[in-house]
């Protein structure tokens, strides 16, 4: 079935209201895009992340008459008579297949591959984590996840256990187990993350070695030889004392989810507990590592 789409330029504060209006007009899907190539790095907790200049793309069936839709939108006070918009024909495609075609196995470090389940494993002798892209949690394509996976690939896991603090999809926890960790504990504030981590551990056959907790349920005195936290700079600062007490003396730490310009400040803050290394960078993002004093 062919489609048409209506692209509208708006500002962030009005994007949600406009999205609701377009759904009432019969749109079958709404997509938000950055209108000025301005990335969002750290939205306020509970806030819908939207750019100051947002492009809304509303998809309609091809026989939907968009002329009266546009006329009604002109009556909205935050759009007005001359709002910027474009109507486009959309090629009919197998969208699910196209989405799947965009994901390929990715290698991290010397040993580790992250492979979608529908792709052939490039190197059966390597350490392979099977993980399908999801809507909410990491799959290895984001620079911060990649930085953490590369670090994990280079560690010695003999007789060591790991904490994945903010486990999300469980990609880091599962990777550590496949790389040789004896036990991993994953902690996340989101119950959906716990469920996603559990499912990915089961898919990779390491569920018996992975313990998963919401913060309020984690065991007292939880401590490990290795801790990785791929969250954001704000929580990394706020939770620093808690994170530090979960790493054994001489244990290893990796922090990511922070921008290049945030790295030095966060590193200096953690230096009261850790001997910190120079930051590693990928694109605009950084990873910090250190050894517990």
Swiss-Prot record:
User: By what name is this protein known?
Assistant: Ribosomal protein L11 methyltransferase
Alphabetical UniProt keywords: Cytoplasm, Methyltransferase, S-adenosyl-L-methionine, Transferase
Localization of this protein: Cytoplasm
**Catalytic activity, per the record?**
L-lysyl-[protein] + 3 S-adenosyl-L-methionine = N(6),N(6),N(6)-trimethyl-L-lysyl-[protein] + 3 S-adenosyl-L-homocysteine + 3 H(+)
Q: What is its EC number?
A: 2.1.1.-
Q: Which gene encodes it?
A: prmA
Tell me which Pfam families the record gives.
Answer: PrmA
Q: State where S-adenosyl-L-methionine binds.
A: 145, 166, 188, 230
The highest taxon in the source lineage is Bacteria
| Entry keyword Metal-binding | no
Which Gene Ontology cellular-component terms appear in the entry? Answer: cytosol
Function description: Methylates ribosomal protein L11.
Similarity comment text for this entry:
Belongs to the methyltransferase superfamily. PrmA family.
A GO molecular function annotation here is: protein-lysine N-methyltransferase activity
Q: Name one GO biological process term.
A: methylation
Q: Which organism is it from?
A: Shewanella piezotolerans (strain WP3 / JCM 13877)
């Amino acid at each position: 079935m062919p489609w048409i789409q209506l692209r509208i330029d708006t500002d962030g504060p009005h994007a949600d209201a406009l999205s609701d209006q377009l759904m009432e007009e019969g749109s079958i899907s709404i997509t938000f895009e950055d209108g000025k190539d301005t990335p969002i790095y750290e939205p306020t907790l509970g806030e819908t992340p939207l750019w100051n200049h947002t492009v809304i793309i509303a998809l309609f069936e091809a026989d939907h008459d968009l002329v009266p839709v546009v006329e009604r939108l002109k009556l909205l006070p935050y759009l007005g008579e001359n709002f910027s918009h474009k109507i486009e024909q959309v090629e009919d495609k197998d969208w699910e297949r196209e989405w799947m075609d965009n994901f390929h196995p990715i290698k991290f470090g010397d040993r580790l591959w992250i492979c979608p389940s529908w792709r052939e494993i490039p190197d059966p002798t390597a350490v392979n984590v099977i993980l399908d892209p999801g809507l909410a949690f990491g799959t290895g394509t984001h620079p911060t996840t990649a930085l953490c996976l590369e670090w994990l690939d280079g560690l010695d896991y003999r007789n060591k256990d790991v904490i994945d603090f903010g486990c999300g999809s469980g990609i880091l926890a599962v990777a550590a187990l496949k790389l040789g960790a004896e036990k991993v504990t994953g902690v996340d504030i989101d119950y959906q993350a716990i469920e996603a981590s559990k499912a990915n551990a089961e898919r990779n056959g390491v569920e018996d070695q992975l313990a998963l907790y919401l913060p309020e349920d984690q065991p007292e005195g939880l401590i490990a030889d290795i801790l990785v936290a791929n969250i954001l700079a704000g929580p990394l600062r706020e939770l620093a004392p808690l994170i530090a007490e979960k790493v054994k003396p001489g244990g290893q730490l990796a922090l990511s989810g922070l921008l290049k310009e945030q790295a030095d400040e966060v590193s200096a803050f953690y230096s009261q507990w850790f001997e910190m290394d120079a930051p590693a960078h990928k694109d605009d993002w950084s990873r910090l590592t250190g050894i517990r004093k």
